[in-house]
Amino acid sequence: DRIIVASIMGETEDEWTQLARLVTDAGCDIIECNFSCPQMTVEGMGSDVGTNVQLVQAYTAAVKRGTTLPVLAKMTPNITDMTVPAVAAVRAGADGLAAINTIKSITGIDEETMQAHPGVMGKTAVSGYSGKAVKPIALRHIYDMAVCPELSGVPISGMGGIETWRDAVQFLALGCSNIQITTAVMQYGYRIITDVIGGLTDYMNRHGIASLRELVGAGLE
């Protein structure tokens, strides 16, 4: 009753294909292509990929060459129109989309060292901002993809600021087939998952909803 999603990121087409083969052989159920991580020290990786349609298309195709598993393309919010790379990924064979990753940012400066947070062994990099504050940004990008004619019927895995069952309902209502939670788990522990499931179950019982599928896209009608 559980699945394993392997998140991968390569630097070349060959690396993407090889990584896809490795995680497939390891037994994962779904592959998520990380085209969107802002914390990179190498050009042409992470969120740099997600803003480059040609790279999104090439790397998605490379992953598909290495696996028969479903492939999700994880989109960067550090772009004006997320539908552009999303369409490119789907045309290259992506089976679904995941959004959003963190917001490219500088989260603070250490006034003693004058280096940006987080500092690791004396080195810093542009960071990614996550948590409750990014939810409205996530909902906007997800809505854009959900109503895009070229992405009609493409499953979306939603994330970005989800902390409660109410947040989960909102993501589902805008078309997400499922949701992902990371920052809230880091803040509050794994009990947050139990809380979300419990709240969703109660909400469904109160509204006579038999399946979560009934909620998917309900806010788009």
Task: Enumerate the language-model features and the residues they cover.
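Alpha/beta enzyme core
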Residues: 9-157, 163-179
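N-terminal capping/small domains of soluble enzymes
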Residues: 1-5, 9-14, 196
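Shared catalytic-loop signature of beta/alpha-barrel
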Residues: 169, 174-209
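Contiguous, function-dense segments enriched for cysteine-driven chemistry
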Residues: 153, 184, 220
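Short amphipathic alpha-helix initiation/capping segments at coil-to-helix junctions
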Residues: 134-138, 161, 185-193
